[in-house]
């Protein structure tokens, strides 16, 4: 479960970074 949680956190961080990058490029 812990390993899965770590993967989930890494995925979430990637999505956040991607979203932030998209917002920056959008502006």
UniProtKB/Swiss-Prot annotation:
* Top-level division of the source organism's lineage: Eukaryota
Q: In which tissues is it expressed?
A: Expressed by the venom gland.
Q: Give the free-text PTM comment from the record.
A: Both chains alpha and beta are N-glycosylated.
Domain Peptidase S1 residues, every copy: 1-27
Cell location: Secreted
Q: Which EC number(s) does UniProt give?
A: 3.4.21.-
Q: What is its main location?
A: secreted
The annotated modulation of its activity is:
Inhibited by diisopropylfluorophosphate (DFP), benzamidine, heparin and hirudin, but not by plasmatic thrombin inhibitors, antithrombin-III and ecotin.
Instruction: Give the GO biological process terms.
Output: proteolysis
Q: Name one GO molecular function term.
A: toxin activity
Can you list the GO cellular component terms from the UniProt entry? Answer: extracellular region
Keyword tags: Blood coagulation cascade activating toxin, Disulfide bond, Fibrinogenolytic toxin, Fibrinolytic toxin, Glycoprotein, Hemostasis impairing toxin, Hydrolase, Platelet aggregation activating toxin, Protease, Secreted, Serine protease, Toxin
Q: Does the keyword Chloroplast apply?
A: no
Assembly information from the UniProt record: Heterodimer of an alpha and a beta chain. Subunit beta is constituted of two disulfide-linked polypeptidic chains, beta and beta'. Calcium appears to be required for structural cohesion of the molecule.
Which function does this protein serve?
Snake venom serine protease that exhibits alpha-fibrinase and beta-fibrinogenase activities. It replaces missing factors VIII (F8) and IX (F9) in deficient plasmas by activating purified human factor X (F10) into factor Xa. It releases serotonin from platelets and induces platelet aggregation in human (but not in rabbit). Has caseinolytic, arginine-esterase and amidase activities.
Q: Which family does it belong to?
A: Belongs to the peptidase S1 family. Snake venom subfamily.
Question: In its UniProt entry, what is this protein called?
Answer: Snake venom serine protease Afaacytin alpha/beta/beta' chains
Organism ancestry: Eukaryota, Metazoa, Chordata, Craniata, Vertebrata
